[in-house]
Design a protein with these regions (language model features):
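Short, structured segments at the rim of ligand-binding sites
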Residues: 1-428
Length: 428
């Protein structure tokens, strides 16, 4: 699908879909719990539906109804052997978490995915699972792969380049036969691990860890219990309408946001404020008032929030001066190399970008329409759409974004929501 975007702004009120990270963790725990769980307001997207299918294939019973809530009857940790490899689509989080859960089964469980997922590194997680007693086979440390358990517990080191490796092991380790000790020499994306720990705390899982998150001791032989939880709005997704209002001079009110939630990407509000944005927040909401905003440059550390790099690079393109986005080398390991891709595509739109190993420097300027490519990365596609909205009203040609169907990975209603709010979008 191609998305054509012309000069426009958004104004109005909206709600963002539920958090993808919370939805996948909820599915993982519910699928292993003994008894019925209820997940309210889940994100229904390509990634979460891949995880839902995986949970069903492993023996969980799930009733979707109208998708306002999912009823999940878990396996109690006794998974069945799937009839075929589990297709995780484009979900890196899902692949890593469900690969770790598969290590609890004595049957071989295989995983596949799309072309992008097959490029995502899996070796650090597979090596840790092997240390804990599983047997794994893979295509050079990548998907497709097979995991045969059960893990028995033990001690291993975990590469913290991606927090997903640690989160996956923390979700599987309580159900291992023995205790598990996880050593983490360094850790990126700390808020995502804190989200996992919050879920484990609600489950009363017995584990200990130090304040620097370098050592975790998980007691084995535990059981997940059924739960009834509501998924909060996704701050990673909320960044897009907030940014669109900021850079186009529009206004937006988002109501379903919980600023007490551990989601790291709520930091978008503070990061944008550091660049001059005026964002009002309160219990459950964030608001940008209509009117022009004079944005200025800043130096932003995105180590905890790598998913914000694409949209913040667009905000930086609309700001005066040179904005530096740094300490976020892991952004190169997402659905695409987001540093390289955003630098390349913004240059097409007339913006000067200097790329370095762990980030980029963006010199603000006047964006011009261009034919750009999302490289099938949902956050890149949405960020480029917002960049296209800022191009001059006198421009005759639109910005055209290739592979815009990738937006369905996390925000399937993006085009409809933005069009309702005033964006000039046309999907072909």
């Amino acid at each position: 699908m191609h998305l054509s975007v012309r000069h426009s702004q958004i104004n109005g009120e909206t709600a963002v879909p539920g958090s993808k990270s919370h939805t996948i963790r909820a599915l993982a725990i519910a699928s292993l719990a003994k008894g019925p769980s209820i997940i309210k307001a889940p994100l229904v997207s390509d990634d979460t539906l891949s995880c839902l299918s995986a949970a069903c294939a492993l023996g969980a019973w799930i009733r979707r109804g109208d998708d306002s809530l999912w009823q999940v009857i878990g396996t109690g940790g006794r998974m069945i052997e799937p009839a075929r490899p589990l297709d995780m689509g484009n979900s890196g989080t899902g692949l890593r978490i469900f690969s770790a859960l598969a290590s609890l089964s004595s049957s071989p469980i295989s995983f596949g995915g799309d072309e992008s997922l097959q490029k995502r590194p899996m070796e650090p997680l597979l090596a840790a699972l092997n240390d804990l007693g599983a047997k794994t086979e893979s295509d050079g440390g990548h998907c497709p792969l097979t995991v045969t358990g059960p893990i028995r517990g033990g001690e291993t080191s975990v590469d913290g380049t991606s927090s997903q490796y640690l989160s996956a092991l923390l979700l599987a380790a309580p159900l291992a036969e023995g205790d598990t000790i996880l050593n983490v020499p360094f850790l990126n994306e700390v808020p995502y691990v804190e989200m996992t720990l919050a879920w484990l705390k609600r489950q009363n899982i017995n584990l200990k860890y130090n304040k620097n998150y370098t050592r975790f001791h998980v007691i084995g032989g535990q059981q997940f219990k059924p739960f009834n939880e509501t998924i909060p709005g996704d701050f990673s997704t909320a960044a897009f309408p907030l940014a669109a209002a900021i850079v186009t001079g529009g206004g937006i009110l988002i109501r379903n946001l919980d600023f007490n939630d551990p989601q790291g990407d709520k930091a978008f509000v503070d990061l944008a404020r550091r660049m001059g944005a005026d964002i009002e927040t309160g219990p459950g909401f964030a608001r940008v008032k209509p009117g022009p905003v004079k944005l200025h440059s800043a130096e932003l550390d995105l180590n905890s929030t790598p998913d914000l790099l694409p949209i913040l690079s667009v905000v930086a393109a609309c700001a005066d001066g040179i904005t530096v986005l740094k300490n976020v080398a892991q952004a190169r390991l997402k659905e695409t190399d987001r540093i390289a891709v955003m630098a390349h595509e913004l240059r097409k739109m007339g913006i000067r970008v200097e790329e370095f190993e762990d980030g980029m420097a963006v010199t603000g300027g006047k964006l011009k329409p261009a034919h750009v490519d999302s490289f099938r990365d949902h956050r890149v596609a949405m960020s480029l759409a917002i960049a296209g909205m800022t191009c001059g009203a006198d421009e005759k040609e639109p910005t055209v974004i290739d592979s815009a169907e990738s937006i369905g990975v996390t925000y399937p209603t993006f085009i409809d929501d933005f069009s309702r709010l005033g964006a000039d979008f046309y999907a072909v």
